[in-house]
Each structure stands twice: as structure tokens, then as C-alpha cells.
């Protein structure tokens, strides 16, 4: 639709205004529970195709510094003082003129966002991604996944995607074209698997929060906080030091992360 408008008007002023008006930060729109769960995980690099500022607002509420990159030009801005790096692949609401929305924007993406794609490709090769609410309709992502598979073959990094299972009934009503949608989803799952993306099916989107909560629990159950104090000067400090060393060694050897204060 955006491309049809550009073909007719030959300028994107109205599109830019629509993006700015629709996605502008509002006091009555706050981060969801899913946003808060994601922000609580030990993840430093996030990728999104959304224009809005909800992710930035989430970290602001947590008192965590977040640096957003939305173009090759601002990708070089220092992130030394940022705890979180947010990559907005399709642009930002405050810079609507560079937003990826029309067909020609996607076609030129390899040239206009060369550095962004290079960084995304690098992280896809070195990190594990969890895709949430992503349809994989972006041809650029498919191209990257295909190239990674070609280079690494069966040794490529494994990634995960959560999708809603096609059911016979939706909201109490019979699902239209159920058989077609089921076959299509099964083919999608196999296709994603070929690209190293493992699909996790849920019956309801609310289950995503359950999955994220379990991930959070498993991540932090390996964290151990150690602290203590003693006032008795007769205590054998060498024994205490030895106990601390023995305990720390035992924990580290078993994969625990130690925090002290």
C-alpha cells in the first residue's frame, strides 16, 4: 500500500506524518509484561523492526541505559556507556523519512543499510536469537539466513522462534481455511528448520510470558550472591579466606556465577 501511494504521489510526506503520529510515544501506552520480562534477561543486544519507542521506555523504567541504532549513519555512535544496544532495522519514529515501509525501501536495503546487515549477520553467526512476533516476511532476513546456511551448512548457530499453533477454532469460531493454514504452517516450520530456526508452537500468545519467565528462572538460578561480615577479632582470617576460595572454586566448576557485596 505504501508503495502504491509513492507511485501515485512521488513523495512520502504523508507517510512520514502517519508514522510519526501513529507511533509517537504516548503516556497511556506502556510496556507490556512481555517487554518487562525480556528486559529482565541478561541480554545486551536487541533487534526489532518496530518504529515505536516501547523498548526504550521499558529500559528507562528499569533505570537501564539504552542506545538505539536505526541507520548506518548512527551505527558508529559510541556505545561504551550504554548497557543495552537496540538495533531498529526498519527505522525509528523520530526519523520517519528513513523508515523501511515501501517495496522500494526493501529493494534498496542492501545498499542503504549495508553496515546494519553486516552487524546482524555477524550476531546471527555468533549468538542465539529468539524471534518473537516476527513473521519472517522480510526478504532481507531470508537472504541472510540462506547465506549463513550456505557458509556454515549444518554447523550454523541454532535459533528459536515462537509461533501460535493453527487450531480448528479461533475465539470460539471455526477457523477459515483451517486445512490450508495448517499445511502452510507445517511447511513453514520445516523451512525455518532448514535455516537453523527451531519453531516453538504455543496455543495462546499468553504462553510466551510463561516461556520467558521459565527462561528467566533458569538463568538466574545459576547466580549466587555471597556476602558476610565478622566483628570478632579472634576469628581465624586464614580459615575464612580458605573457605571462601574453596566455596568459590566449587561454584565456578559447576557453572554458577558469583556475585558479592
Task: Identify the role of each PLM range.
Residues 103-119, 144:
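Active-site glycine-rich loop that binds ribose-phosphate moieties when present
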Amino acid at each position: 500500500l505504501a508503495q502504491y501511494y509513492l507511485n501515485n504521489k512521488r513523495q512520502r510526506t504523508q507517510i512520514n506524518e502517519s508514522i510519526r503520529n501513529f507511533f509517537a510515544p504516548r503516556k497511556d501506552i506502556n510496556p507490556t509484561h512481555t517487554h518487562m520480562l525480556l528486559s529482565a534477561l541478561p541480554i545486551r543486544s536487541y533487534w526489532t523492526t518496530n518504529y515505536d519507542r516501547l523498548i526504550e521506555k521499558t529500559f528507562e523504567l528499569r533505570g537501564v541505559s539504552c542506545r538505539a541504532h536505526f541507520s548506518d549513519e548512527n551505527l558508529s555512535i559510541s556505545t561504551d556507556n550504554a548497557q543495552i544496544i537496540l538495533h531498529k532495522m526498519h527505522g525509528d519514529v523520530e526519523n520517519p523519512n528513513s523508515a523501511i515501509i515501501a517495496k522500494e525501501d526493501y529493494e534498496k536495503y542492501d545498499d542503504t543499510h549495508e553496515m546494519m546487515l553486516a552487524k546482524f549477520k555477524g550476531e546471527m553467526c555468533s549468538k542465539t536469537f529468539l524471534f518473537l512476533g516476527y513473521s519472517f516476511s522480510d526478504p532481507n532476513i531470508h537472504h541472510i539466513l540462506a547465506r549463513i546456511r550456505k557458509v556454515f551448512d549444518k554447523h550454523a548457530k541454532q535459533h528459536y522462534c515462537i509461533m501460535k499453533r493453527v487450531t480448528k477454532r479461533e475465539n470460539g469460531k471455526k477457523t477459515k481455511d483451517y486445512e490450508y493454514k495448517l499445511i502452510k504452517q507445517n511447511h513453514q516450520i520445516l523451512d525455518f528448520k532448514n535455516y537453523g530456526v527451531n519453531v516453538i508452537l504455543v496455543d495462546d500468545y499468553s504462553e510466551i510470558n510463561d516461556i520467558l519467565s521459565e527462561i528467566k528462572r533458569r538463568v538466574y538460578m545459576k547466580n549466587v550472591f555471597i556476602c558476610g561480615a565478622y566483628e570478632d577479632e579472634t576469628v581465624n582470617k586464614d580459615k575464612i579466606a580458605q573457605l571462601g576460595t574453596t566455596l568459590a572454586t566449587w561454584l565456578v566448576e559447576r557453572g554458577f556465577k558469583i556475585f558479592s557485596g
